[in-house]
Amino acid sequence: VLGLWLFVALATRECALRLAQFGAPGSGWAELGALAVPALVLIALARPSALRRALFGPHDDACRLAGCGPLALYVFTRLWAGNATPGDAAPLPWLPLLNPLEIGLALAVSGLVAWARSLTPPQRAAVPRALPASLAGATALALVTGAVLRACHQLAGVPWGEHALWTSTLAQAALTVVWSLIGVALMLAGHRAARRVPWLAGAALLALVVAKLFLVQLADHGGLARIVSFLVVGVLMLVVGYFAPLPPRRAQAGEAVAAP
């Protein structure tokens, strides 16, 4: 396990230094270098292989948790930190989802998912059931939010900073539309699968959107972008109210099916 950590640390350092030469400090290249090696190691060790048998031997399950767990924690924390950066891709042109930072974030997500799926049932049972789903949902929303804000910064010239993004009519309108679409998608999926948890998660996200509309965008005099935001949210709420009402509880659904 110590040898694995040493290898990952040295390889990550070397990869980060090499890729950082392509851009300025803190660019997307540096983040890609910091995430690529540990994420790829998590992916490589997620499935039974000769490499994993050579590293962990007869203690595969325990060593996979003790050896790869800290790597997964590093990747998770680095993913959140990298998501808060503008992700400059110079000297290459910046492309949504195809820039160094977001490629690194995609590798990180793939590595975390692969590692989580490789855990044994007893190891999964030791973790509260709501915790992985909550972390996954919060991380997914944060990644989508970061991608939208980076697109506004890179493509529309909105300055990268808390105040500038908070007061930008374009950034706030884009977040409103994207969050609303995600909320509606969750509610539709929950209704179709007769599962209340995703439906309630989508409803909570739509409630957050409405609060943001009134607390942030209502005070803004941005004109067209603000009007479009209100119209989109209103139409989506009408759609979801008609096509995806709150699904019944499982017990109630079972009684309804059993009734003649």
Task: Give residue ranges: language-model regions.
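Alpha-helical transmembrane segments of multi-pass membrane proteins
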Residues: 1-260
